[in-house]
Amino acid sequence: DIVMTQAVFSNPVTLGTSASISCRSSKSLLHSNGITYLYWYLQKPGQSPQLLLYQMSNLASGVPDRFSSSGSGTDFTLRISRVEAEDVGVYYCAHNLELPYTFGGGTKLEIKR
């Protein structure tokens, strides 16, 4: 199985500044077709996870372009520019390169008070 690894907490960020969340996979998620099968989800408090980005860098419908993702085959970064209070929650990376699809343990976005 492919193991997705994330830090439990982000570095605390101030509202209005940028945040970065990292994810590492134990196997390259770059397919021979050129697609990287890496996904990012956000689970806000009391809600189900929502898809943010698919195939590494494509924004899901309705997701603001403050969110972006980049990376290599195994190391990925989710970037949030101009962090807002509504961005608080747990961010998960996941893959669907091959079965079983697996998720990282999640990274909680910490806001400086």
From Swiss-Prot:
Location of the region described as Framework-1 in the Swiss-Prot/TrEMBL record: 1-23
Region (Framework-2): 40-54
Lyase in keyword set: no
Region (Complementarity-determining-3): 94-102
InterPro entries: Ig-like_dom (IPR007110), Ig-like_dom_sf (IPR036179), Ig-like_fold (IPR013783), Ig_sub (IPR003599), Ig_V-set (IPR013106), IgV_Light_Chain (IPR050150)
Region (Framework-4): 103-112
Pfam families hit by this protein: V-set (PF07686)
Sequence segments annotated as region (Complementarity-determining-1): 24-39
Covalent S-S links between cysteines: C23-C93
GO biological process, one term: immune response
GO CC annotation terms, alphabetical: immunoglobulin complex
Keywords, ordered alphabetically: Adaptive immunity, Disulfide bond, Hybridoma, Immunity, Immunoglobulin
Region (Complementarity-determining-2): 55-61
Stretches the record annotates as Framework-3: 62-93
Keyword Disulfide bond: yes
Biological role: Anti-streptococcal group A carbohydrate antibody.
The protein's name in its UniProt record: Ig kappa chain V-II region 17S29.1
Source species of the chain: Mus musculus
